[in-house]
């Protein structure tokens, strides 16, 4: 079992740093509680070994990034984590009870809409524990409180301490926020640990239910009726979970909108490839940084849409922000349109692609100005009208 624990720690270290972080925290928390209960130093040493295995895997996964940083210098702009995000995306207990907007029950979906219309801080909207998950969480809380009231501290489930720690650490304004105020803002989205709470409570409920079943059935023999009732209860629970957790399917109208967008993007890209030389570079407007830098009217990664269907075109969007290689793009915004286009052509770009959603007046002034500059070759326009490509070629 010791080697299994080491292996689990190492595998966790290979995954997203959020879950490496919580594994190490909960492992150390469990070791401290067990040491307090049993005064066992081997427990502490085992926990430290698991944490060391996770740390070793974390180092292995990030070694290339760190060596690149040593060779090329730090990139302070690549991953910006401001303190405000720790407050906005912190874990909120009430959000564990708020169903998604896509819930199959119109009553619950309406409750979610009403909540989101007035709530000042909205997280990533994925903290809902579900009916069964909430029942297990409340059951765990009841067992823990009852044990404390009866002065049976040793009987408080370890899982209760783990959930309590997650809440204290990652809730809005919690210990993670204190660390953030001191400058450590890496773990900005404490709400993501809601899935860990669900996993802990469900596993505890299964173990607790199995223990109760063994106690009730000790010395008894189940007859067919009892087995049938148990099976029916399990099936009913599964049906509730599926109904509660699987979102309402999109309507035909919603599917049709997505299909039109996909078909439009695919056809638009095919027209660009037919009109431009193989390997041509396309400068995309509005100028956006990557990653996580949206502009009004566009999501952060809208510029990737043509890339999904391209075979031989190259695009200006997608280089990691913070490095000097692409700083010239941001400088274009300080120049006149004529100077900016001249610089774009000088760097070898064959066309300008405009997402009209990212501009006031749907970018019509820019398109008119380009035509006035002599780029009057017929533009390539997507079927949905939001994308337009203007070749930088004068007749």
State where each predicted segment sits.
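Membrane-helix boundary/interfacial segments in multi-pass membrane proteins
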Residues: 76-81, 110-131, 152-203, 319, ...
């Amino acid at each position: 079992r010791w080697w299994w624990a080491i292996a689990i720690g190492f595998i966790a270290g290979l995954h997203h740093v959020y879950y490496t972080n919580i594994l190490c925290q909960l492992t150390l928390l469990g070791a401290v509680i067990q040491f307090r209960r049993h005064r066992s130093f081997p427990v502490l040493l085992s926990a430290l070994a698991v944490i060391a295995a996770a740390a070793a895997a974390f180092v292995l996964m990030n070694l290339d990034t760190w060596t690149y940083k040593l060779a090329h210098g730090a990139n302070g702009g690549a991953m910006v984590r401001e303190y405000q995000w720790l407050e906005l995306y912190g874990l909120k207990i009430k959000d564990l009870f708020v169903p998604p907007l896509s819930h199959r029950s119109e009553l619950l979906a309406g409750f979610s809409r009403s909540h989101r219309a007035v709530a000042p801080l909205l997280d990533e909207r994925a903290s809902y524990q579900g009916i069964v998950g909430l029942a297990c969480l409340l059951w765990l809380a009841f067992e823990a409180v009852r044990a404390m009231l009866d002065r049976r501290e040793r009987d408080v489930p370890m899982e209760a301490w783990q959930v309590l720690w997650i809440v204290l650490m990652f809730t809005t304004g919690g210990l993670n926020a204190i660390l953030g105020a001191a400058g450590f803002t890496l773990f900005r989205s404490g709400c993501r640990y809601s899935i860990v709470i669900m996993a802990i409570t469900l596993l505890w409920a299964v173990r607790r239910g199995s223990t109760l079943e063994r106690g009730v059935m000790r010395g008894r023999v189940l007859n067919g009726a009892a087995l049938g009732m148990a099976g029916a209860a399990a099936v009913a629970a599964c049906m509730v979970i599926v109904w509660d957790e699987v979102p309402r399917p999109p309507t035909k109208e919603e599917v049709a909108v997505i299909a039109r967008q996909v078909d439009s993007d695919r056809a638009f890209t095919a027209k660009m490839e037919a009109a431009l030389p193989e390997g041509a570079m396309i400068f995309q407007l509005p100028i956006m940084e990557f990653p996580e830098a949206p502009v009004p009217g566009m999501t952060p990664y809208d510029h990737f849409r043509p890339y999904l269907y391209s075979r031989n075109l190259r695009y200006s969007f997608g280089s990691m922000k913070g490095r000097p290689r692409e700083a010239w793009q941001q400088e274009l915004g300080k120049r006149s349109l004529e100077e900016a286009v001249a610089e774009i052509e000088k760097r070898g770009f064959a066309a300008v692609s405009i997402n009209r959603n990212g501009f006031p007046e749907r970018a019509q002034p820019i398109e008119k100005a380009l035509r006035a500059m002599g780029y009057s070759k017929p533009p390539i326009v997507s079927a949905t009208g939001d994308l337009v490509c203007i070749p930088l070629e004068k007749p």
